[in-house]
Amino acid sequence: MSGTGKFIALCKELESAVKARYGGTSHGESAYVFLSKKAEFKPYTKELDLIREVRNLIQHKDVEVKGKEAIYVDEVLMDALREIIGLVQHPETVGDICTRDLVTAGLSTPVKEVMDRMLDSSFSHIPVLDGQGKLLGIFSENTIFTRVAKEGMEALTEQDCISDYEAYLDIRDHVRDSFEFIAETVASEEAVERFKKRDGQGRRLAMLVVTKHGDPSEKVLGVLTPYDVLE
């Protein structure tokens, strides 16, 4: 097969992969334009545009001069095309990009210790886990504000442990932020779309808690925040 023939074959493989994964494109949009609009493929915008232009030139023009191909497609572009095909066929998953080295707390952890960890790590939300590594709730600065609002400043002591805040840890009860579970095998682009939305109460999604199947009763494997996936 000629060089241009190999290139066209790869283009068709990519187009088939896009159709298989996404069910095709809308409004007759080319696979290359379609992919360039997706966050996952933003780093490949230049390559996708070039591939599209070269493909159209070869497909719709006579590229032979005196019976020989007048266009040479370099392996650099071929390799980029193969890489994009690989990403479409084997998409990056939540498990690939989530943070697994977590800063966590247990019910017996002193609050002062947790706050020091938050300052040192710049994490604003700390997962509180039980002895099996399952999520009990999320501790944040708003957890403290909520307790003060409910119980008064006199309720706070230097000896406080996370258990003293147990009534305010439930992920459903945070006022400003929401939290969801997600399976580690879910495509990362779905996580991106989730972070762009607000829930029915207008709360932003602050964290995705990653488990094997997205089940709250499973061990926490990692977390994902908007800063991990959004530019």
Regions found by a protein language model. Give the residues of each.
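Amphipathic alpha-helical interface elements
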Residues: M1-E53, H60-I97, G106-F123, V128-G131, ...
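Short, local alpha-helical segments
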Residues: K37-A39, H174-S178
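A structure-centric signal for secondary-structure junctions around beta-strands
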Residues: T45, R176, R204-L205
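Short, low-complexity disordered segments enriched in Ser/Pro/Gly and basic
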Residues: G95-T99, D173-R176
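The conserved cystathionine-beta-synthase
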Residues: T104-S122, L129-D130, V148, E180-H213, ...
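Active-site-adjacent beta-strand anchor residues
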Residues: I138, F181, E218
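A conserved mid-domain beta-alpha-beta active-site/ligand-binding segment of alpha/beta enzyme cores
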Residues: D164-L169, S178-I182
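Terminal recognition/anchoring or ligand-binding modules at protein termini
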Residues: V210-K219, V223
